[in-house]
């Protein structure tokens, strides 16, 4: 809170991960306390832990009482490709996006653009169509893949699954921004 004067009206707390929703009890307490001091709160999430099953759903709704904004990563709209990329289905992620729209919770959608994995035109079109069904999207961002973290995998002796994948070129980035209509949301 010592930085609150520096933030003025444009700052706050963003919790990212790993996956912050795996620590939902902590988040509820942390954000509740932040709100007591008038601090803006944001969750940066991949959304996979989301479920409408109890007890998670009640806790999630309580957390939303203290959350101002969510940054939601939709890595791939195509479920088969999403499973290939991440190892799990995107069903919970898309359901979370729909639920956040139902409750009118502000969201920024973020899409990591990885050549030959998440940059297919037909999938970008489908993602755009999905985003169009949501009433709460304030911003859409294309995040071009980069190799800055590859050394961490090498240091740990873990095979880097994207070894040899190059960042997208300006054309592919521009194409994704156009298809996802990012300029409409800025």
How should these model regions be labeled?
Residues 2-12, 17, 21-143, 148:
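Conserved AdoMet/S-adenosylmethionine-binding subsite of the radical SAM
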Residues 182-186:
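Radical SAM enzyme core and accessory elements
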Residues 129, 138, 154-179:
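A structural motif corresponding to the C-terminal lobe/cap of the Radical SAM core domain
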